[in-house]
Amino acid sequence: MATTVYGQASLPQMHSLFSKVRPFLSHSPSFTAPFTRRRSFPFSALPTTKAIDAALMKEKWLDSLSLTSQDEDTTPENAESSCIIGIDPDLSGALALLKFDHLGSSSFAQVYDTPHIPVLVGKRVRKRLDAKSIVQLIQSLDVPSGSRVYIEQSNPFPKDGKQGWYSGGFGYGLWIGTLVASGFCVIPVSASLWKRHFQLASGSCTKDDSRRVAAELFPSLSSQLKRKKDHGRAEALLIAAYGEALKTEKLLIQPKELLSQVNYLENQLVEVK
């Protein structure tokens, strides 16, 4: 099998991604925009002015993660394909690239391990992301400027310790800064959202389950998902597939849509009064 400089297979054929992703949609709860953990709009819990402020802040935050407008389609009219990138930003994570033609009839996938280097921290050698190699990896993808990148939000846990908190925040920030500077539209997604989408959010689910689901969606990449340490590859693929499902099924609610719904509710309240 032909490999790239990063040791990954070159553009293997995906196997009916849409036919396998869509069944999850019918069993998944409705989704709000990334960052939103509630399953429905929190109008009953928040005054409408606070809901508007929250929507505006989220819109400004998302705008700051892209050099192009979130609503602007930067794909050239004569382009033969569109791209979605999914990233697990951890040191053991990966970058997944999905390519689709305009008819959705053929799809390709690639996955790359996150480049990292050994660094001496005190008296211990630790891993840190290799910024230069990440830039080179992104440049080698040949992805149109303005393409969407879905990256898992960094949410450190108390048990991770200071080094875990530092490493997680450093990696997350490095990825976002590099992606925005490279001209991508970056959309952070909480782990609970994409895992719930693929029915992996229950306490009994493990990283092995992520590898299993990813292998089912991407059978041509199953050989790269066999080892336990390949969970980062699996999660990057699932994050990318989740992003494509949001785009295809129009489940991603934009802040402007939220504002229009807030305005509608305000008008309803005025009529009641």
From Swiss-Prot:
Changing D88A: Abolishes endonucleolytic activity. Disruption phenotype: Albino phenotype and decrease in cpDNA copy number. Keywords: Chloroplast, DNA recombination, DNA-binding, Endonuclease, Hydrolase, Magnesium, Manganese, Metal-binding, Nuclease, Plastid, Transit peptide. It comes from the Eukaryota. It is an enzyme of class 3 (hydrolase). Its EC number is 3.1.21.10. Residues 1-53 form a transit peptide. GO terms for cellular component: chloroplast nucleoid. It catalyses: Endonucleolytic cleavage at a junction such as a reciprocal single-stranded crossover between two homologous DNA duplexes (Holliday junction). It is found in: Plastid, Chloroplast stroma, Chloroplast nucleoid. The gene is MOC1. InterPro entries: MOC1-like. This is Holliday junction resolvase MOC1, chloroplastic. A structure-specific endonuclease that resolves Holliday junction (HJ) intermediates during genetic recombination. Cleaves 4-way DNA junctions introducing paired nicks in opposing strands, leaving a 5'-terminal phosphate and a 3'-terminal hydroxyl group that are ligated to produce recombinant products. Mediates chloroplast nucleoid segregation during chloroplast division. Its main location: plastid.
